[in-house]
């Protein structure tokens, strides 16, 4: 914990093409080694592929996919008298989005398509339909929280 003051949160500028702040944040998650132009090309390429295949607003599908991936509860380890319990806790809205974006990018990278844009497009479309590896991850996290509901009285 900082001794002085908590650093102020900086606002992310809207992305130039769609004017969406959440998409700009997502580009930052895709970006590696500070290469923002590459990240933009990947994300815009993926959204174009989604538009081609689904014939609908790609931003709408992107937001639908994020909603399908974002977890409502997660487990945190809490030590009580020599035993470690997995305590279910609600996820803050900002962390929900961050986790959803992280999982989306991670599982897109593990897919088999040739380019990252194609992988990302595939994972986005799968997530919007309620399937795919990122949605499975969310379900696993929810299952863990449900299994450890008995320890929810050890709140933080």
Curated annotation (Swiss-Prot):
One annotated GO biological process: translation
Assigned protein family: Belongs to the universal ribosomal protein uS7 family.
Signal peptide segment: none
Protein name: Small ribosomal subunit protein uS7
Single GO term (MF): tRNA binding
SUPFAM superfamilies, sorted: Ribosomal protein S7
Subunit structure: Part of the 30S ribosomal subunit. Contacts proteins S9 and S11.
Organism ancestry: Bacteria, Pseudomonadati, Pseudomonadota, Gammaproteobacteria, Pseudomonadales
Source organism superkingdom: Bacteria
Record Pfam families: Ribosomal_S7
Keywords of the record: Ribonucleoprotein, Ribosomal protein, RNA-binding, rRNA-binding, tRNA-binding
GO cellular component, one term: small ribosomal subunit
Function description: One of the primary rRNA binding proteins, it binds directly to 16S rRNA where it nucleates assembly of the head domain of the 30S subunit. Is located at the subunit interface close to the decoding center, probably blocks exit of the E-site tRNA.
Encoding gene per record: rpsG
